[in-house]
Structure formats: structure tokens, C-alpha cells
């Protein structure tokens, strides 16, 4: 088992994943997301890559109350994706809510990165 990432490392990982998710959201559309299994899997993987560090920051209480409130739901997403419970994952919502979720969750991330 590897070492736990530091707060700064987790913030950087989340920021990098958010940038990749935003880039993918600009390249795809609902039709591609619906018809392309590989694209859909890539988006789910990037969601997991984004949600994991945010969830770790929340669980380990490495961030304040405002960030914990903003990111609390990311742990549910991480748990669903990490345990591959496909029947519980609303893949369409992962795509449809991508811009809104990034807009809501990136603000605390940007503030914390600026303070690091």
C-alpha cells in the first residue's frame, strides 16, 4: 500500500482531473456520449479521477466546512464509480451535469490551490 497523498497533492490531482473533464466536455456531445461506449467509459473514469481526491480531502478533513459542503456529494459519485455498480450509475446525468458540477466544485478548489 502506498503513502497517502498530501493535501497539496490531492488539490493538484483534483485540479488536473477537472481540467481534463472540462476539455472532454468541450469535445463531446450528447449524441457521442450516448452512442460511444469508449467515450462514455472515459468520461466515467475522469469523473472517478476527479471525485477521488475531493472525497479524500473531505473524509480526511483536510479542508474547511465550505469545501466539505461543496464536495460532499463527490464521495457518492466516487463510491458508485469505484465499485462499478453500473445499475446505480446514471451515466446520462454524469454527462448532462458535467458543466454545472464543475462550475460548483471548482470554485473552492481554485481558492484552496491559490492559498497553497
Report each predicted region and the residues it spans.
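Solvent-exposed interaction patches of small proteins and small membrane subunits
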Residues: 1-116
Amino acid at each position: 500500500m502506498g503513502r497517502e497523498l498530501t493535501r497539496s497533492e490531492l488539490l493538484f490531482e483534483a485540479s488536473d482531473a477537472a481540467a481534463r473533464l472540462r476539455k472532454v466536455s468541450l469535445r463531446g456531445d450528447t449524441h457521442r456520449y450516448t452512442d460511444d461506449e469508449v467515450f462514455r467509459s472515459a468520461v466515467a473514469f475522469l469523473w472517478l479521477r476527479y471525485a477521488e481526491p475531493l472525497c479524500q480531502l473531505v473524509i480526511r478533513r483536510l479542508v474547511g466546512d465550505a469545501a466539505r459542503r461543496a464536495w460532499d456529494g463527490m464521495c457518492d459519485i466516487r463510491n458508485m464509480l469505484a465499485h462499478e455498480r453500473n445499475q446505480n450509475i446514471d451515466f446520462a446525468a454524469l454527462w448532462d451535469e458535467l458543466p454545472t458540477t464543475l462550475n460548483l466544485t471548482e470554485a473552492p478548489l481554485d481558492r484552496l490551490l491559490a492559498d497553497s
